[in-house]
Amino acid sequence: MEELQGYLKKDRSPQQHFLYPLLLQEYIYTLAHDDSLNGSIFYEPIEFIGYDNKFSLVLVKRLIIRMYQQNFLIYLVNDSNQNRFGGHTNYFYSHFFYSQMVSKGFSVIVEIPFSRRLVSSSEEKEIPKSQNLGSIHSIFPFLEDKLSHLNNVSDILIPHPIHFEILVQILQCWIQDVPSLHLLRFFLHKYQNLNKTIQSNKTIYVFSKENKRLFWFLYNSYVSECEFLLVFFHKQSCYLRSTSSGAFLERSHFYGKMEHIIIVCCNNFHKTLWPIKDPLIHYVRYQGKAILASRGNHLLMKEWRYYFVNFWQYYFHFWSQPYRMHINSLLNYSFYFMGYLLRVLINPYAVKNQMLENSFLIDTVIKKFDTIIPIIPLIGSLSKAKFCTFSGHPISKPIWADLSDFDIIDRFGRICRNLSHYYSGSSKKQSLYRIKYILRLSCARTLARKHKSTARALLQRLGLGFLEEFFTEEEQVLSFIFPKTTLFTLHGSHRERIWSLDIIRINDLVNN
């Protein structure tokens, strides 16, 4: 335990005071404009559902000053004065809006030391700032290179803490002033009470669902704590030196990649060394789902599952069911990760070998990493978004019928381009044509609904080339990337995997 405490003190930053700049009107943007924070997550605008504004540090600063002048922090705690804003409804919306903005400002402040820690760690490891670690597609080349050489995989659903106090306790080592922890508890209890009003007010529910920056930060801190201690316990059971690992801060998520973690696994009582041949462990995670793959046998994966379950139980004080960690062989198992269906294909080949006058055939097997577009979950997402029925029959989008023709076509075209861009790494892109077909007819039906016509009459009047760019956008991009001298033709380009290193978050229509 003393060794663990020393490890925690060595790696973590000093405790911070957060409530002082929040209450005393210190300009938060001056902290964010520090040279070490340029280009960090604080400059990316976040859309505000139900408002024309976009969340920014300047907006947070102005609202904090306004609340300070009106002593609004007192009214946030005191719910009895509900007529201050002219009625219960106006008070509820104003109360919720100010509470959300203060929570966002609080989350911006507590993110600053994490960003400083990220910059300092990258400078120590001499990691260039222009790296492609911000792209979530950078995980797939790693899987493509490593997964085909491994035997077993375990896809893990990281459990959510059952109580908000667990999240507060995790931050106690970072936050020194007690009032900040009390303010954090206040936000969490307000969020918990807000969920009780979901049935009575769906607008507030949608608003709270899209504005969870503080709660994402808390959850990411919890996951980062899991991986932080995972590295420590791995080092305790390590007989071979492992390479360095790190956690990188995205706009709204942490994700970590630990490559080439070489271990020799001991049993639970540290008595006998298991004779496991080359037990190479690979770990990747995005949001709440992680993948643990190994070249070792099934017993090694069961040991890791036993460790995870006990770790969550004794360190975070909640029980996690073992069925949340599925252990399967990579040769006969497919699993979902970040909107893709991943698997390892076995391609048998017969190689003819000629030795002098004798010739014989040698059977060999080549493993290949395969990425598939899950069409059925995508159709389900389109159905929830009211683009089609549950069976995939295209329907009109009535909420967009009041827009101009250009805006309607642009929105549908943007969805198609984003999906094509996100699934550029699939080896079977022709399966995406059905999704484009649904969106194309949904666009035609929406335009027909606006002009009080039928989709058939609209398509006959505009011709077969209507919305053809939905289907040719990807080919135009590929023709620009690959010259005509490339060995493969554009007709077969749907088999080529192209990982895009400019995607920073998962697509809204993709089921994670």
UniProtKB/Swiss-Prot annotation:
Any one GO BP annotation for this protein: tRNA processing
Keywords assigned by UniProt, alphabetized: Chloroplast, mRNA processing, Plastid, RNA-binding, tRNA processing
Predominant subcellular localization, coarse grouping: plastid
GO cellular component, one term: chloroplast
Gene Ontology terms, MF aspect: RNA binding
Transmembrane helix as UniProt keyword: no
InterPro entries assigned to the protein according to its UniProt record, in alphabetical order: Domain_X, Maturase_MatK, Maturase_MatK_N
Subcellular location: Plastid, Chloroplast
Protein purpose: Usually encoded in the trnK tRNA gene intron. Probably assists in splicing its own and other chloroplast group II introns.
HAMAP family registered for this protein in UniProt: MatK
Family listed: Belongs to the intron maturase 2 family. MatK subfamily.
Protein name in UniProt: Maturase K
Organism: Lilium tsingtauense
